[in-house]
Amino acid sequence: MKILVTVDGSDISTRALKFALKLAKQSATGSSVTVLHVDPPVFPGVERRIGKEAVQAYHADNHAHAFKAARKALGRTQVPVEEVSAIGEIAGTILAVAAKRKTDLLVMGSHGRGAVKGVLLGSVSSKVIAQTTIPVTIVR
């Protein structure tokens, strides 16, 4: 089973990663986990003002923060794990990576910030669920 789990450095994404690892261990031999961090692009014009190198450093720092927490949660797992970082619209990038890697299951954390905020702004998890045929497990 190929499991894709999204991380952002938060406690809830660490919980989602631990859940994905547990699932992979219980599944058939050959299961693997891809740990994905997606950083949204900077606002238009920012790169022009601060420079390409500063934007690259900003994204690198964000990826490092997300993966630092993930690596701590991984410990000494026997499950094959690969880290993937990307820059783009979060939900769309998650879906693209999942499709490219022929993912069998998506595991995501939900911050549960409330129904009103979810209706007004939309959440990444609800966008992903609405646009995929891949099974999705939401961890809270």
Q: What positions do the PLM features span?
A:
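Aromatic/hydrophobic pocket-lining residues that form π-stacking "cages" and hydrophobic walls in ligand
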Residues: A20, A70, I94, V128
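General small-molecule cofactor/ligand-binding pocket signal
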Residues: T34-L36, E82-A86, T137
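A short acidic, glycine-rich active-site loop
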Residues: K52-H65
